């Protein structure tokens, strides 16, 4: 998986992490309050599985497997390569905040999207990919 050019995401007015707009459904966002991909700590990327317009950038998340590589092009022209260590699907009400955003001793990556069957117009779960820097 290649993350492509990243959108910059911050915090929404309600204090939650921003997500890309529907218009940017085919782009992945980088949560700028976390570290830059490749730096020590968890870098966090967020993208849509789908939107009202149809499939989005992370529509193939179900094909990601442990051991797969994720390539992130950095603003400084270098590339960070991560290897998937774990995939997790959780109810949004039980989001593992400390596991996703907590400090780590090495460069790590989190990729977050929505999952589960649509209920009342929304997907109730988050799918989280955890990966470690390998190059």
Mark where each language-model region is.
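Solvent-exposed, non-transmembrane regions of membrane-associated and secreted proteins
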Residues: 1-65, 74-76, 86-135
């Amino acid at each position: 998986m290649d993350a492509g050019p990243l959108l910059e995401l911050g915090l929404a007015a309600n204090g939650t992490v921003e997500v890309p707009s529907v218009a940017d459904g085919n782009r992945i966002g980088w949560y700028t309050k976390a570290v830059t991909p490749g730096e020590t700590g968890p870098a966090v990327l967020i993208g849509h599985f789908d939107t009202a317009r149809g499939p989005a950038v992370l529509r193939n998340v179900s094909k990601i497997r442990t051991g797969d590589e994720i390539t992130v092009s950095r603003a400084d022209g270098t590339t960070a390569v991560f290897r998937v260590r774990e995939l997790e699907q959780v109810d949004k009400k039980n989001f593992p905040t400390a596991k996703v955003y907590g400090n780590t001793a090495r460069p790590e990556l989190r990729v977050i999207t929505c999952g589960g069957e649509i209920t009342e117009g929304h997907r109730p779960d988050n799918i989280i990919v955890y990966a470690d820097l390998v190059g």
